[in-house]
């Protein structure tokens, strides 16, 4: 099902959406933070999706617990380190870990630039102990408004040498992409690649805006592109990658069932599309789970799954030589 001759990658993976349950428990107790459960065993349902529960509100509540315990920069560094470990232990050859320093900082008023430094330090420490390639993507969380995103951007750009790209995430309907055109001009001027969450809560126009105005060469989720034939044609022609996260889309009620997921529609239209975990800690999944789902629920053949694996490597924010090195390591 997973072709071991092709690098296995996860390009849409939120570092702040992947905090271990035991880490939430330990950090909560270490810092005197009231948790919603009185044992490690009973904590899991408050921080992870259980069964077929699907609601954006419930999903976001669980996500909030993951950053609620980031009481100091050591906690941030620990979570970053464990993200590298989890990527390696799940069998990934390469992962792009994205994070919103404002979101991670806000509960305990941590310095935004300090959060970025702690993430970088934690990842570096993880890479010494685990054999996996990692790159970082900075997120601007649009839900907190333009001024907060400016603070976030400045903290991230201060460490741009440790980033490969910038992302825009959060409330797509309440804070449309055009509010952040100036922010992304600074991103482009800094020489970073751009991806954006778009076409998830809003329609295809949000994706057009992200591509044409923000400068996105990849789109996170993008499920609503299928209602715009001209956009689908554009995506295929210009090799704009779709970072698809089927289980997360189900958990957030972006789609009502796997059967309704548009993954197959993208593939049939020749759009470059990859499989990703999104918030693996909240969804309690790993990348292999997404490939199993793609086979059993999305009805992809083994040949199609291999193509999806290759797509991920092609879409990655890597140089050609780095891509070749990933393939060479699989021989």
From Swiss-Prot:
Any one GO biological process: hypoxanthine salvage
Cofactor note: Binds 1 zinc ion per subunit.
Binding site for substrate: 14, 16, 170, 279
Pfam family, one: A_deaminase
Catalytic activity: adenosine + H2O + H(+) = inosine + NH4(+); 2'-deoxyadenosine + H2O + H(+) = 2'-deoxyinosine + NH4(+)
Cofactor: Zn(2+)
GO cellular component, as recorded: cytosol
InterPro entries listed in its UniProt record: A/AMP_deam_AS (IPR006650), A_deaminase (IPR028893), A_deaminase_dom (IPR001365), Ado/ade_deaminase (IPR006330), Metal_Hydrolase (IPR032466)
SUPFAM superfamilies cross-referenced by the UniProt entry: Metallo-dependent hydrolases
Zinc listed as a keyword: yes
Gene3D superfamilies: Metal-dependent hydrolases
Annotated site, Important for catalytic activity, chain positions: 221
Gene Ontology molecular functions: 2'-deoxyadenosine deaminase activity; adenosine deaminase activity; zinc ion binding
Function, in words: Catalyzes the hydrolytic deamination of adenosine and 2-deoxyadenosine.
Membership in a protein family: Belongs to the metallo-dependent hydrolases superfamily. Adenosine and AMP deaminases family. Adenosine deaminase subfamily.
Protein name as catalogued: Adenosine deaminase
